[in-house]
Amino acid sequence: MLAHPTLDKLNTMGLTGMAKAFSELISNGESEQLSHAEWLGLLLEREWSWRYDRKLAARLRFAKLRHQAVPEDVDYRSERGLDRALFMKLIGGDWIDAHDNLAICGPSGVGKSWLACALGHKACRDDRSVLYQRVPRLFANLALARGDGRYARLQRTLGHVQLLILDDWGLEPLNEQARHDLLEILEDRYGRRSTIITSQLPVSAWHEIIGNPTYADAILDRLVHNAHRIDLSGESLRRNQRRKS
């Protein structure tokens, strides 16, 4: 490694991005042609990029997104009824700033989870905290947390994350404890944070899945009242890919 007093100081101060850029610049003969302002600009840009990349990697690790999906890879040509104008607006993220929700509904295999994860990835890139949870596993984890003392901490995490993705909602009816847990989560989030929920069932069927009419009214009021809607249709994309292969 190149030895240089300035390089040592940059590393000591934890300016790793600057240190790497400095090492490259002084090893490059063309760097002598740069002005002091250009040198400083390059060093700052590399430090900013290095810190941004580290923060993004940490956010993605925390998010635990199911798919490595990004908005740039969304296929608007497939015949599934995806409104390009609406989705582009959602990519912008203003709805998250407004603490709105998003419901993505459609049959199995049309890309609901993938689209949700693409929006989650973009939110991470926009320096927002994101957490992905499959609903059946979430309720199981909450039950375990209630027994080992993690329940309050897990509820705080679910309530405070800026974008919560609840995937595979409505696969089975909710029991009494699940209804209570879900209402507590949504109560903490309503008007303060945004939630994406994906389901094979149309929103009109969610009341029945929740079961208890009082809970159903309270849950849906907090979940659907301020929700954008994406209703997908068509054949399973996974099935079509298997046919092509």
Swiss-Prot record:
Which Gene Ontology BP terms does the record give?
Answer: DNA replication
Q: Please tell me whether the keyword ATP-binding is annotated for this protein.
A: yes
Domain of life (superkingdom): Bacteria
Give coiled-coil spans as residue ranges: none
The GO molecular function terms of this record are: ATP binding; ATP hydrolysis activity
Q: Cite the Pfam families for this sequence.
A: IstB_IS21
Q: Which residues bind ATP?
A: G106, P107, S108, G109, V110, G111, K112, S113
Q: Which UniProt keywords apply?
A: ATP-binding, Nucleotide-binding, Plasmid, Transposable element
Recorded hits in NCBIfam families, A to Z, give: IS21_help_AAA
Q: Belongs to which family?
A: Belongs to the IS21/IS1162 putative ATP-binding protein family.
What is this protein called in UniProt?
A: Putative insertion sequence ATP-binding protein y4pL
In the record, what lineage is assigned to the organism producing the protein?
A: Bacteria, Pseudomonadati, Pseudomonadota, Alphaproteobacteria, Hyphomicrobiales
